[in-house]
A protein has these predicted regions:
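Acidic/polar-rich alpha-helix caps and helix-coil junctions
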Residues: 1-163
Length: 163
């Protein structure tokens, strides 16, 4: 996980080549030899994510809108859709999602990047049909993302996070 974290930091700082190098070291170690390609170029990653639709209430996809991120990039800008930076961050998030499956760490990425969450519900078992119910969306800006501060901190005159 340290390599993925370092890759994310390098990409956010504008060192796309350094971030990609760390991601390739991780994929070479994580993916089994002979079963899949284990190193990727920036152009290949960008082409892959450019071809995917963004996830929304009607489309299931590993590609998420990252424009609501709660941080700025190294130059003070925000994440722009369709750029190499966005594609590499999408790849970082996908690698981390695979690596930390069932560990509960995805929540931090969801909060940091302001990712909308869609809860898909199977509506027809025979047809393998899914939909997002009306109450099945947690927007990236939803205050339920906020973590409650402990009572000791509130007693010390710190204001509780809005929820």
């Amino acid at each position: 996980e340290a390599l993925i974290n370092r890759a994310e930091a390098k990409i956010r700082l504008g060192d796309l080549a350094g971030g990609l190098a760390d991601l390739n070291v991780w994929t070479q170690a994580y993916l089994r030899p002979g079963l899949a390609k284990r190193t990727f170029t920036q152009a290949e990653i960008k082409a892959y994510y450019d071809a995917l639709p963004y996830a929304d209430k009607t489309t299931r996809s590993p590609k998420k809108h990252l424009t609501k991120a709660h941080f700025k990039l190294h130059d003070g800008s925000t994440i722009t859709e369709g750029t190499a930076t966005e594609a590499l961050l999408q790849y970082v998030l996908q690698c981390r999602r695979i690596l930390t499956l069932h560990e509960g760490l995805r929540w931090q990425d969801i909060k940091r990047y302001g990712i909308d969450i869609y809860r898909w519900k199977k509506i027809d078992a025979g047809a393998d049909t899914f939909e997002v119910p009306a109450d099945g969306v947690l927007l990236g800006s939803d205050l339920r993302h906020a973590i409650a501060l402990p009572q000791q901190a509130i007693t010390g005159q710190i204001q509780q996070n809005p929820r």
